């Protein structure tokens, strides 16, 4: 279940000078609508994150949601966690997102406590973790920061622990890449976004979100030492991967 929000009209009117996309108050207000209409398969990913957490969570361990935004993945995991002594740490560097995330988390009663932290995920200590989630977050970090964060996650995971990584993908074959971009734009059109909105959002986000290929992700997982990893979900050029320690 995702929190309701106002409709996303941020890029509906012409903007003279388009700045870089930021997760500010305006975005936080419309985020559930924005992400449902922009990310193919988002609801499926959120639901399955809960199911994956249920399989991999261990008693008396920590679960991390890094780049938690409004807490959709956190809430999905908390609904599925039945083990004793578990704690979810949800982290985001956007004050507007953190404020709303706390409201959403506090609206549901659960035996699994959630701590919502306003911080840079690169500075968070990962320890005693059985599950770590990076849901459309890693792609906003610089390439060198991505590797360092994944190394830190690996070190903080218990043996048998899982990293769930959802990302937008680029494809090495140019024809495939362009086709999947076009299909994604068709998806956005079908969800009511205009050509102006699609174009302006793309201009705003292209400098701050730099996606990797699935091959890049797998090579990184292998180099860091994860024993098993693969794609478990994909819709167009969006998908989710697992990596098991």
Swiss-Prot record:
Pfam family, one: Methyltransf_25
GO molecular function terms attached to this record: carboxyl- or carbamoyltransferase activity; S-adenosyl-L-methionine binding
The enzyme's E.C. designation: 2.1.3.-
The species this protein was found in: Vibrio parahaemolyticus serotype O3:K6 (strain RIMD 2210633)
This protein's name: Carboxy-S-adenosyl-L-methionine synthase
Keywords, comma-separated and alphabetical: S-adenosyl-L-methionine, Transferase
GO BP term, pick one: tRNA wobble uridine modification
Catalytic activity: prephenate + S-adenosyl-L-methionine = carboxy-S-adenosyl-L-methionine + 3-phenylpyruvate + H2O
Family, similarity comment: Belongs to the class I-like SAM-binding methyltransferase superfamily. Cx-SAM synthase family.
Quaternary structure and partners: Homodimer.
Keyword Metal-binding: no
Residues reported to bind S-adenosyl-L-methionine: 42, 67-69, 92-93, 120-121, 135, 202
Top-rank lineage group of the source organism: Bacteria
Signal peptide stretch: none
Function: Catalyzes the conversion of S-adenosyl-L-methionine (SAM) to carboxy-S-adenosyl-L-methionine (Cx-SAM).
